[in-house]
Amino acid sequence: MLEKNIREQIIDLMHRQVVPAVGCTEPMAVALCTARATELLGQKPEKISAFLSANILKNAMGVGIPGTGMIGLPIAISLGALIGKSEYQLEVIKDLTPETLEEGKQYVSENRIDIKLKEGITEKLYIEMTCEAGGKKATAIISKTHTNFVYEEADGKVLLDKQVLAEEGAPTDNKDIQLNLKMVWDFATTTPINEIEFILEAKRYNMNAAEEALKGNYGHCVGKTMDRPLSRGLFGNSIYSHILSKTASACDARMGGAMVPVMSNSGSGNQGICATNPVVVFAKENENTPEELVRALTLSHLTAIYIKQNLGALSALCGCIVACTGSSCGITYLMGGDYNNICYAVKNMIANLTGMVCDGAKPSCALKVSSGVSTAILSAMLSMENHHVTEAEGIIDKDVDKSIRNLTSLGKDAMNEMDIMVLDIMTNKGAC
């Protein structure tokens, strides 16, 4: 068992990285930043200016905003200013009503919102919101993670500036323990169960999102389609088909704008879904014990957090690669696998899915989620037969942690030019 102080640091990390969110986290982070700038202004803004990193723009252009029936940033910004409360974090617009939605639509129609790409920055997650009214101005900036405010200014007075601290090399709030896969395994499998039972909240949130998808036609209805007779004829009424259905359904609801919270992982709701629902469904149908489920969910979520430590909050790689690697580990554990089997599953996932491009948050993410979950199951099955991709093949290293770093190096560094090209394609398409 890991030492108590190490366990406490990991638990603190999980509590910060596995949190509820309503809607896609990028537009919600923009709404959150808008809400804070509005609070600093102290009145309803007459004008709002947004300066955003390319990855924020990419992930917010085509996704449904919960409870609005609309997509994109203008309505998210409008609602952040009109009803948003920064204390709600990524549930910032949960007080939405039909009346305030109409106010938000009216605000958008008045062309009060200006959205631009922030030039000259390297940070992939950057949100700068400036609100103006009555000759007053207030600015809030979020950077690095979806709820991390680094700058606040009102009426020319700087109230918060973590950017200066970072530039001068002074200590910042980054206290995250640096993980490796063996540490993740040891924590998940040996920590006293009462210390990690909180992870069951992810099950409650994300399985509820899957049920919500059945109440409407969200996104491309990938999950609902998996439940229909034709799909049953092809895939059978099996654990495999149930896992795909429950995971894709939750993604359908979230990307389609359902007003339903999910438990996110590392700033992504879809990653939270992928790290949760496959493990929950497998544990139920495999008749695993409640304790085994808790440990499998912990292993899944913490594996995803570990990989994201190296990759960063946003990248050119589709996040389902990361989260489904986590769920593959969780399923492998539920199958009775040991640490070696977990390593095999991780290597199989990296060998299969590396290179899947993130082209923004949108309803079709449910298709990528289905591909990721399918690969997670296959990787787990192969690992339990001691079959795995070896160091003689591609980017896989004998050391599993080096294999993970190979994956993250590609996503964080090598694919930057591709990320720019993806955004250029997205912003220069003809009218839909």
Predicted features and spans:
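Acidic-glycine-rich active-site phosphate/pyrophosphate-binding loop
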Residues: M1-I11, G42-I56, S238-G257, T289-I307, ...
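Hydrophobic alpha-helical bundle architecture
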Residues: T38, F282-R295, I305-S371, M384-G394
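N-terminal signal-anchor module of multipass membrane proteins
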Residues: I6-L41, P45
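Flexible, glycine/charged-enriched surface loops at secondary-structure junctions
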Residues: K44-I48, Y88-I93, D114-L117, I193-I199, ...
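Conserved phosphate/anionic-ligand binding catalytic regions in large, soluble enzymes, centered on
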Residues: P20-R36, V260-N277, G319-V322
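Early transmembrane hairpin of solute transport permeases
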Residues: A31-C131
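A structural signal for small-residue-enriched, beta-sheet-centric alpha/beta enzyme cores
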Residues: L2, V22-T25, N55-I56, S143-T147, ...
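Signature of multi-pass transmembrane helix bundles
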Residues: S109-G257, D424-C432
